[in-house]
Structures are given as C-alpha cells and as structure tokens.
C-alpha cells in the first residue's frame, strides 16, 4: 500500500523494510464537545475497555476545531507541527502532549476520556488518532505517567503480579 503525504525516501524505505504493514481495525469514538466522529486505528481492539485517553496528531483536522475553542494552545500546537517527522517518531523519544480540555466517548462502554494532542502521533499513519491504553502499550504508559493520566489494566497474567505496561 502506498503512503500518502510526500514522505522522504528514507521514511518510505523504513516503512517497507522495517515497520511492515499493520493489521487491525478502525474504531469510531465520538467527540463530546462537537458531536463529531473520531476514527482511530488499533491493532489491539481487545484492549478497548482499558482506554483512558485519546491522542491526535497536531495536523489532525479536529485540531482546527479545538483551536477555535482554545486559542491559547496554538503556539504549542505549531511547535509540534514544526518538528521533524522522523524525530517525532523516533524510538525512545520523550512524548509530549497538550491537554485540549475536550473528551471522546468510548463506543464500547460510553466512558468519556480526555482528548490530547501528541507530537508522537503521525497524521499519515492510520487515522492520525490513537486510543490510548497505557496499561498495555509502552508509549501510552510513558505518556500517562508523564501527565498523571489514568492507567487501567484489562489483561492480566495467569500467575503473579502484573508489571506495567503488560504488553
């Protein structure tokens, strides 16, 4: 499958040779503040009950709507947009986020969770939006710990104590 968005040849090569194609499903969350759909791509729909927040890329179209309601975060969003895409996606890079004050509703259980803008979410991968399950994903876990977000386990080991993130 072709990548959209004029990616540098280096990124295209990494996608083809290292990352490979991701298989998963699209889940549609509802944005509470403007009653619009926010599709997210996930490879682990089995963890949907552990979603404690959602994150969109700074280039995501919903960000324009958020900025109309909250112009105070515009400079922080612009700084994220101006970062190098390879740097943003780098393994081990600290993840940075902006709390939008908005929420999305989990379509499986109706729970409303905060919506963030994150520099590590890329618009040209999946839908540009992530359902965050910090108990079962290392990136989500690091982000949740940094910003003191809820961590909810939904998968447990057969024996012993759970060590987070349990992936």
Enumerate the predicted regions with their spans.
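Non-cofactor substrate-recognition interfaces
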Residues: 1, 23-167
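Short, Gly/Pro- and small/polar-rich lid/capping loops
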Residues: 4-26
